[in-house]
A protein has these predicted regions:
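A short coil-to-beta-strand element that immediately follows conserved catalytic motifs
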Residues: 16-17, 91-95, 130-132
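Alpha-helical structural signal in soluble globular domains
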Residues: 9, 120-124
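Membrane-proximal basic amphipathic "stem/tether" segments
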Residues: 125-166
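Low-complexity, flexible helical/coil segments
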Residues: 23-29, 50-57, 125-138
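Conserved nucleotide-sugar donor-binding catalytic segment
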Residues: 25-26, 32-120
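Conserved donor NDP-sugar-binding/catalytic core segment of glycosyltransferases
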Residues: 1-31
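A short, hydrophobic/aromatic-rich structural module that often spans a beta strand
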Residues: 6, 73, 149-150
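Short, surface-exposed helix-loop/turn micro-motifs enriched in polar/charged residues
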Residues: 5, 71, 129-132
Length: 166
């Protein structure tokens, strides 16, 4: 069913289709839906798309390049930022496309993610000072969120409030 939804969104002018992700955190016994935020201008700063839900036409890779294998932690963010900055056409389908568990490579080494984030941001025209500031801000924000997630009841309550606003 998920593949049919992706196929329906792929009109001839669309290069990339993204959807939503069922995020599973087995350690904290949590499940919630993470939506791809189609705030594409932010791609040069942060990954606003749920990368496992992104389906890319082969022609997009041929036009704008492949993953930069010199990056280890945020090559997906680099790729999507590059595609966007070079004119790729993104489409969003408001459906859960994949289920994903917490604990990927980018969760394991915040310092390396920060360093690569500066590289990707500056490649996409962000001044280095702004890239560093935004990276530090995001690091503090993620620590706060992680602390809240450790408090299951509070996280469930806050997530319920957020869901009601959307």
């Amino acid at each position: 069913e998920a593949l049919m939804k992706i196929a329906d969104a792929f009109t001839p002018t669309v290069d990339i289709v993204c959807g939503d992700c069922l995020w599973i955190d087995a350690e904290r016994n949590l499940q919630y839906i993470r939506k791809s935020k189609m705030q594409l201008k932010k791609l040069k700063y942060e990954m606003v798309l749920m990368h496992p839900t992104c389906f890319v036409r082969r022609t997009a890779y041929e036009k704008w390049g492949y993953f930069d294998i010199n990056l280890r932690y945020i090559m997906d963010k680099d790729l999507m930022a590059r595609f966007y900055s070079r004119g790729a056409n993104f489409e969003y389908t408001p459906n859960v496309i994949v289920s994903m568990s917490a604990g990927g490579a980018s969760d394991a080494n915040a310092k390396k993610v920060f360093e690569e984030g500066i590289i990707v941001a500056t490649r996409n025209g962000v001044p280095r000072g702004i890239a560093v500031f935004r990276g530090k801000y995001k690091g503090i924000r993620l620590k706060l969120i992680k602390g809240i997630k450790n408090q299951k009841k509070l996280w469930g309550f806050l997530y319920t409030l957020k869901s009601k606003r959307n």
